[in-house]
A protein has these predicted regions:
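Alpha-helical interface subdomain recognition
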Residues: 1-83, 102-105, 114, 118-119, ...
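Structural signature of FAD isoalloxazine-binding scaffolds in flavoprotein oxidoreductases
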Residues: 66-75, 134-138, 182, 210-212, ...
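N-terminal glycine-rich flavin-associated loop
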Residues: 86-106
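Short beta-strand-to-turn element immediately C-terminal to the catalytic PLP-Schiff-base lysine
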Residues: 101-103, 143, 169-172, 181-184, ...
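A short, Trp-centered hydrophobic/proline-enriched beta-strand micro-motif
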Residues: 118-129
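A generic structural signal for well-ordered coil/turn residues at beta-strand boundaries
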Residues: 120, 134-138, 163-165, 176, ...
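A short core secondary-structure module
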Residues: 125, 152-189
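Flexible, small-/acidic-enriched active-site or ligand-binding loops
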Residues: 137-139, 157-158, 183-217
């Protein structure tokens, strides 16, 4: 099949790339990651006001843009390219998607316009101290029944969990799984920012002590949550594609100017092979990711498998590319002053997000019956 971006999509991507280059260069990223929030609130508001990023997947009837997963994919690719710390991923994949999928009309009317305007951020608290992203990792139980329940326990590795205005918590409800909305400043909720390898994706530990929560739709099977994770996997893959390409470009440019034995190191066969392999990883990962986004946008039956293929392929490719970018740079690539290590940190951390690459391939095997 032939899949190409439209002229409008290409122009949108280019304009976003320019905005990120002007407003969030790597030098600014290094300053932002030192802050308590871990992301730039003024940049987020600019993304909302000038580019409409938080409104992309919000339907027009809720003051959104009514775009598709393809446009959201393009956003993530550019955010990854600039390793921009931003609540876009959590708010979109772990906020807008579950609300659209499971929320009541009242909840959609209440939350989505504020999201579209960039007024509130969202996230989902799924993993617990075990770090397991599957159903076996959920031990928190929703106490009570009906529209309002209470939650007690611990959630870990919650993306933007220390700053999100609304948190969607995954908890057991009998033999099913429920999603529950909690205010970020709810009584009994303690939020602690975690120290993580990827400095550009802040995470938090959330302690719940009889915290009041409102159900997001009715409890159901894990397949409901799998859909949210599939969308997240596709967007995460797109972010890795952008970061991977930026990392590769960094290595290529350095190989052109770094001389050894009176010639550029890029002229040596060993370096040429590694750079060529990086290009293969980028193109392969982009192809898998674009198809997954297309399948999700069109509602194709193979979206669940395509999402896992994209995530696993991009995770392996990004880990390879970021690692060899450091190697091509030699000793300087390991230093704090060089940007190569920021991409390497993101690669190794993202490789485990939503489950390791091995876990992803095993889940794919289960889905296709192997």
């Amino acid at each position: 099949m032939q899949f190409e971006l439209s002229d409008e999509q290409l122009e949108f991507q280019k304009s976003l790339r320019r905005m990120i280059s002007d407003r969030s260069p790597i030098k600014s990223v290094r300053e932002v990651i030192k802050t308590d929030a871990g992301w730039d609130e003024s940049l987020w508001q600019q993304f909302a006001d000038q580019a409409g990023l938080p409104a992309l997947l919000v339907p027009e009837e809720y003051d959104g843009a009514g775009a598709t997963l393809v446009e959201a994919m393009l956003v993530m690719e550019e955010l990854g390219r600039g390793i921009v710390p931003s609540p876009y991923f959590a708010t979109t994949a772990f906020g807008v998607v579950p609300i659209l999928t499971f929320g009541s009309e009242t909840q959609k009317q209440e939350l989505l316009p504020s999201v579209a305007a960039g007024e509130i951020t969202l996230t989902t608290a799924l993993t617990e101290p075990s770090g397991n992203w599957g159903p076996d990792g959920v031990e928190m139980v929703a106490a009570g029944s009906g529209e309002t329940v209470t939650l007690s326990g611990t959630k870990s590795f919650v993306i933007d969990g220390h700053t999100a205005d609304k948190i969607i918590v995954v908890a057991k409800a009998g033999d099913q799984y429920g999603l529950y909305i909690v205010d970020g400043d709810a009584s009994g909720l303690t939020r602690t920012k975690q120290t993580t390898l990827d400095l550009t994706r802040p995470m938090a530990t959330l302690e719940f002590d009889n915290v009041a929560a409102t159900g997001l739709g009715e409890p159901g099977g894990w397949d409901r949550i799998s859909h949210v994770l599939d969308v997240a996997a596709t967007l995460l893959a797109a972010e890795m594609v952008g970061a991977m390409e930026a990392s590769m470009t960094m290595a290529v440019e350095y190989a052109k100017v770094r001389n050894q034995f009176s010639r550029a190191i890029g002229s040596f066969q060993g370096i040429k092979h590694r750079l060529s392999e990086m290009a293969v990883e980028v193109d392969t990962s982009r192809a898998a990711t674009w198809y997954a986004a297309y399948a999700g946008a069109e509602g194709l039956d193979d979206f669940p498998t395509a999402a896992l293929v994209a995530k696993a392929t991009a995770a392996a490719g990004f880990a390879f590319t970021a690692s060899w970018t450091v190697q091509v740079h030699g000793g300087i690539g390991f230093t704090w002053d060089h940007d190569a290590q920021l991409y390497y940190r993101k690669a190794k951390s993202t490789e485990l997000l939503l489950g390791s690459t091995t876990d992803t391939w095993l889940e794919l095997a289960d889905r296709i019956g192997v």
